[in-house]
């Protein structure tokens, strides 16, 4: 195989400033696009973290409200159970409503 010869004796001429600026100008839109993209990703990341914190606070508040509601439900169940006792019903019937147990003359047996 034949190998190509390379000449290293030639020195590249220094580029002119205008050419360097032109080359930089070609990269500027890409760098700007990358910078904008990184900014958008950063803003989205911060927004999502703030949203997660807000949702965690909301979950904690709802959990607290649920606990309060369950305690209220248990208290109301106990109150209903105490109001349903036969002794209390009889006391309310006699005291507040003026009711009494019927006498033998007030009882009618139907055959």
UniProtKB/Swiss-Prot annotation:
Keywords: Cell cycle, Cell division, Cell inner membrane, Cell membrane, Coiled coil, Membrane, Transmembrane, Transmembrane helix. GO terms for cellular component: plasma membrane. Residues 48-111 are periplasmic. Residues 51-85 form a coiled coil. One of its GO terms (biological process) is cell division. InterPro entries: Cell_div_FtsL, FtsL/DivIC. Disulfide bonds: none annotated. It holds the Pfam family DivIC. The chain crosses the membrane at residues 27-47. It is found in: Cell inner membrane. Its main location: membrane. It is a single-pass type II membrane protein. Residues 1-26 are cytoplasmic. NCBIfam families: ftsL_broad. Essential cell division protein. Belongs to the FtsL family. HAMAP family: FtsL. This is Cell division protein FtsL. The lineage of its organism: Bacteria, Pseudomonadati, Thermodesulfobacteriota, Desulfuromonadia, Geobacterales.
